Amino acid sequence: MNKLVRQLLDLNELEFGVDRVHPVVFDIDALIKNVVDSSSILVEQNHAEVELADELNDVCNVYADEFMIEQVFTNYFTNALHYCNDGGKVRVWTANKDYDQPRRTEDGLVTGNLRVFVYDEGPNIPDDELDKVFIKFYKVDKARTREYGGSGNGLSIVAASMAAHNKNYGVYNVENGVVFYFDLDIIQQDDGEPEMIPENNADNTSEQ
């Protein structure tokens, strides 16, 4: 119950703007690996095979609220572990796309969009349920939710966190599994002065 109460408090703060976004520069690859490493017991309990893409061995600085993004990735990763088949794979990878025009922030130059993907090898989500899984308390498979002790709030926190960042997130089915994703701004800390556009006019919407 304590976990449920904490999730509800976090969600209410996000929904009502109490917990504002505090963007900082951090290495998203390091964050991902830290979350995966700290989840080793859960990985073992769910007999999952975790695969991290080669690009996660590099440094990729992003500009976002580090605490919120850690929550987002942790929710995606633990959700994937819970719903992958016994002995199934959970795969994490990223893809980036440069913006047509960079934009300057006080911490550096935002140059592109990074999309983080989390795949689990398990049953698909029914197509008519895909747009509902981020709704508070909603669960596709209620019996399975009870088995894992889920409250239905983890993905709602993802939705609220990404909405606070004004960044894309979502889910889609693939053969033999499900992929969740979210987007972040890539930032470079340098002394250059390339052509800039005002931050409120930047096109941060990546292709789906």
Residue ranges: model-predicted function:
Residues N166-V174:
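Glycine-rich ATP-binding loops of the HATPase_c
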Residues A80-L81:
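Short helix-loop "hinge" at the ATP-lid/N-box region of the Bergerat-fold HATPase_c
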Residues L42-A53:
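Short conserved segments within the C-terminal catalytic ATPase subdomain
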Residues H22-D37:
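A conserved beta-strand-to-alpha-helix junction within the catalytic ATP-binding
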Residues I125-K139, I197-P198:
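Short conserved segment of the HATPase_c
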Residues G87-P102, E106-V110:
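Short beta-strand/loop element within the Bergerat-fold HATPase_c
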